[in-house]
């Protein structure tokens, strides 16, 4: 029987309040925070905070927890100052054959929880990812997945469904919405029983009225402690290759950064590398598109990776309202791809290179145009080559 509670029951009822300095994720998480954790998670949390550069200032026992719902799981600890790449991988043969797909991909969990019988998770944190002056509203939201039977587990590159509370205009429950997962399989706190999302509130005009998206607004407004119906996980299109020597090109706009964040944390966060035993040795190149600098998501973390892993990670930004392309127009991600098309193509010629694209569907035509020109310069036809890459499981696209 499925037990959908927000927090796992602890063995002896003891709870501890842990006060930590410099706790959180990226530039939005600073200062001192207090976390309420069960005894069984205390040692794991302490190790994670130490590995990621946080500082525990106090640990205080509190009254016994009367029920699972009273225990608020630990929030994400700020990533430690860990290593960030620039050198292009050596080109090998043409991109006709895929790098071997690990057998572990056959074990990827899918649809552990379905809409008719969803898992009920608990919100542990919800905070803005945007700096002052940003456009719109984007939040980082974390859910506790403890207590499920089966355990709701997932891997990098998958999505989960959220069923918002309430009913539609016809009196029926709202339909689920899928969101790309923004945390690794270990969660932001490395405990292994949380999942995080990166959610932009959808807003559009209709008949002179501003309409807010049902599920995105539900999530951006939700408070810690609230219960949320979750389905999934789903998806095998965006899975990260298991090959430690693979090369990864990432093209993202807006909240399409979510799966890319999971890849990069798995590659470069010290606590991740220690826990999963997966030591990335290849090259990774992230192209990120945003309207303003204030809208760059997880930017501080990516800058840190680039500075600390210069041989393995490269970070290229396209900020449309602040930068100009070579024609004097706004700088979009497709313009950055066009600028670097020859180098990107040299990466793609290496059969170990995978390309991931996630974000607005409007980015695809421009990227295709840039790749078409680069391929033509080499006497190749991009419209024929792209399906070959897709068939070889090296071209991964998730746009909306």
Please provide the spans of the model-predicted regions.
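Conserved hydrophobic positions within beta-strands
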Residues: 56, 123-126, 181
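Ser/Thr-glycine-rich phosphate-binding loops at phosphate-binding pockets of nucleotides
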Residues: 252-259
């Amino acid at each position: 029987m499925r037990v959908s509670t927000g927090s796992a029951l602890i063995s002896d009822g003891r709870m501890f309040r842990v006060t930590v300095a410099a706790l959180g994720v990226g530039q939005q998480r600073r200062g001192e925070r207090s976390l309420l954790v069960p005894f069984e998670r205390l040692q794991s949390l302490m190790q994670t905070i130490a590995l990621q550069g946080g500082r525990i200032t106090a640990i205080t026992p509190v009254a016994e927890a009367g029920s699972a719902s009273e225990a608020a799981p630990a929030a994400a600890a700020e990533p430690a100052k860990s290593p960030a790449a620039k050198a292009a991988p050596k080109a090998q043969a043409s991109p006709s054959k895929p790098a071997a797909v690990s057998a572990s991909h056959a074990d990827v969990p899918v649809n552990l929880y379905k809409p008719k019988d969803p898992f009920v998770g608990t919100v542990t944190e919800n905070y803005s990812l945007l700096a002052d002056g940003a456009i719109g509203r984007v939040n980082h939201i974390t859910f506790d997945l403890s207590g499920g039977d089966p355990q709701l587990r997932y891997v990098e590159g998958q999505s989960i469904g959220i069923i918002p509370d309430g009913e539609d205009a016809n009196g029926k429950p709202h339909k689920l919405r899928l969101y790309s997962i923004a945390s690794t399989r270990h969660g932001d706190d490395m405990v292994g029983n949380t999942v995080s999302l990166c959610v932009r509130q959808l807003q559009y005009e209709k008949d002179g009225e501003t309409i807010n998206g049902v599920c995105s607004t539900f999530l951006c407004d939700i408070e810690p402690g609230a219960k949320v119906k979750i389905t999934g996980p789903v998806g095998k299109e965006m899975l990260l290759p298991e090959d430690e020597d693979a090369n990864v090109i990432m093209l993202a706009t807006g909240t399409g950064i979510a799966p890319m964040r999971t890849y990069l944390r798995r590659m470069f966060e010290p606590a991740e590398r220690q826990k999963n035993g997966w030591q990335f040795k290849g090259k990774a190149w992230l192209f990120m598109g945003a309207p303003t600098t204030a809208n760059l998501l997880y930017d501080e973390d990516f800058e840190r990776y680039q500075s600390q892993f210069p041989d393995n990670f490269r970070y290229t930004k396209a900020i449309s309202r602040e930068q100009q392309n070579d024609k004097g127009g706004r700088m979009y991600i497709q313009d950055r791809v066009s600028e670097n098309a020859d180098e990107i193509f040299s990466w793609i010629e290496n059969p170990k290179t995978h390309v991931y694209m996630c974000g607005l569907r409007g980015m695809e035509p421009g990227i295709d145009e840039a790749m078409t020109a680069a391929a033509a310069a080499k006497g190749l036809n991009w419209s024929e080559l792209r399906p070959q890459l897709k068939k070889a499981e090296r071209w991964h696209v998730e746009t909306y």
